[in-house]
Amino acid sequence: MGARCLALLLLYGTLLLLLLLPQLPLAGAATRYYTFNVKLQNVTRLCNTRAIPTVNGKFPGPKIVTREGDRVVVKVVNNIKDNITIHWHGVRQMRTGWSDGPAYVTQCPIQTGQSYVYNFTINGQRGTLFWHAHVSWLRSTLYGPIIILPKAGLPLPFTEPHKDVPIIFGEWFNADPEAIVAQALQTGGGPNVSDAYTINGLPGPLYNCSSKDTFRLKVQPGKMYLLRLINAALNDELFFSVANHTLTVVDVDASYVKPFDTDVVLITPGQTTNVLLRAKPTAEAAGATHLMMARPYATGRPGTYDNTTVAAVLEYAPPGHIKSLPLLRPSLPALNDTAFAAGFAAKLRSLACPDYPSNVPRRVDKPFFFAVGLGTTPCPGSNNQTCQGPTNTTKFTASINNVSFDMPTTALLQAHYTGQSAGVYTADFPASPLEPFNYTGTPPNNTNVSNGTRVVVLPYNASVEVVLQDTSILGAESHPLHLHGFDFFVVGQGTGNYDPSKHPAEFNLVDPVQRNTVGVPAGGWVAIRFFADNPGVWFMHCHLEVHTTWGLKMAWVVNDGPLPEQKLMPPPSDLPMC
């Protein structure tokens, strides 16, 4: 009897260990602890001072530095009046969906005076990601970099840099962004655009009252630098370039790519791009001041984006006297240069080598066709006079397959885990538009959308293909779509309407780029594939915050697999309540 009990105890211990494996750091890995105190801080930009939400009083927020395989533990304490969550953008969160962060999807928000501990392990990723708030528009100031170094002893698959530098793009609003979005939702119109772009929180010399608020990157002649580009802007894709310097792209969304040279990088909100920059020899460098500049790639209608340019300075050591040196500005593409956007995306290829294989699904279990774009919804009958949407009787909205997603008041993951989804969500999100139309042609007469909290349920480890098709209902426009909980492979893209009888034969199943956020081309389509190997509930949404606000979002429910290590971990004891 005693031997039998011991055997059962050992079996129980083995099963428990298997359950905990994703939470345990690998041998030689570390556990890295952080505390994020969310609090208001007075910050002045453009000669305008505003009390903004920050982490630990810093803007941008502190960086997290970790290695592949490490566990990261972050205690977030909310000291502001708004509810808060933090999303670890791009982190796979294998079986740890409770730490993903989107409000009312994987957790209820952290209320004022409360705290929550995010606990996750970095699995199979190295490069640059970032963290940001995931409630309303609070991420306009609550963001910071996540630096993922390779496992100790593993070399980089490109030239070792002398130094690496985060370059975070953001948007500055003189007004409170929460008031801006509240007004837009009340009127049904588009929100006011930002007053400036920022690089590492600073607007730079091209804006009024901002020459002293300029980021300066000091470099040594001849040295190699790794720039970790992060687009944390709310609503704008950006072109970026450094005057008189070539950039070598080596990593996107914490996945290595085949290196290629470019003068300009296109980066959408939610994307990261690591580029190498070799500083020029002394004789060349001393003769000029080099600007680093970014401005929007804008395919929407005029007035819907901030049409300004942000600049920083690349400064050689020893620095020259700026007033006496010629000022070199980079050449940036036209605002709506869709050809450059398509060409840049086509250059991105994964390494697809033995050390970093490209495990793209070659067969598809679950195909989906998602038509994405803007639409309308009628104004309330008694408030027609306040409507400022496409017409005076409609409001702007956005949808996937004509479903504008309604956020629940209970976290979807909690409802799924407890088996109490009734009244929270329905598992009937359409796999394709119920009423197909010429997506990039003449818009249909009826532009109204439906509403609902509808999800797709996937069996564990299903191979999934999603074709994301832009629509011209209210004008063709690029949409950066972000998928939580997974990296996906971008197997194809094109202009016009997707043709299922023609385009799959052109898919790249050898070395497609792997990422977590992809730009759906304006007036075109993009195809992605991934394995549903991460149980939980995973948000998918446009990373233009205004479009997410209007409903361009949905959720995937991935069921548990049969084995212990294929099941969602239990919720932590401090999970916030709604």
UniProtKB/Swiss-Prot annotation:
Query: Which Pfam family would be a valid example here?
Result: Cu-oxidase_2
> What are the annotated glycosylation sites?
42, 83, 119, 192, 208, 244, 307, 336, 384, 392, 402, 438, 445, 448, 451, 461
According to its UniProt record, the EC number is 1.10.3.2
Cellular component aspect of the GO annotation: apoplast
Query: What molecular functions are annotated in GO for this chain?
Result: copper ion binding; hydroquinone:oxygen oxidoreductase activity; oxidoreductase activity
* Positions contributing to Cu cation 4 binding: 479, 542, 547
The record's remark on the cofactor is: Binds 4 Cu cations per monomer.
Keywords, ordered alphabetically: Apoplast, Copper, Glycoprotein, Lignin degradation, Metal-binding, Oxidoreductase, Repeat, Secreted, Signal
Chaperone in keyword set: no
Please verify whether the record's keywords include Transcription.
Answer: no
Domain of life (superkingdom): Eukaryota
Q: Which residues form the signal peptide?
A: 1-29
Output the InterPro entries linked to this UniProt entry. Cu-oxidase-like_N (IPR011707), Cu-oxidase_2nd (IPR001117), Cu-oxidase_C (IPR011706), Cu-oxidase_fam (IPR045087), Cu_oxidase_CS (IPR033138), Cu_oxidase_Cu_BS (IPR002355), Cupredoxin (IPR008972), CuRO_1_LCC (IPR034288)
**Sequence positions that bind Cu cation 1:** 87, 482
Provide the Plastocyanin-like domain boundaries: 37-153, 163-319, 428-562
User: What Gene3D superfamilies would the database entry show?
Assistant: Cupredoxins - blue copper proteins
Q: What family does the entry list?
A: Belongs to the multicopper oxidase family.
Q: What does this protein do?
A: Lignin degradation and detoxification of lignin-derived products.
Q: What is this protein called?
A: Laccase-10
Q: Please report the organism this UniProt entry assigns to the protein.
A: Oryza sativa subsp. japonica
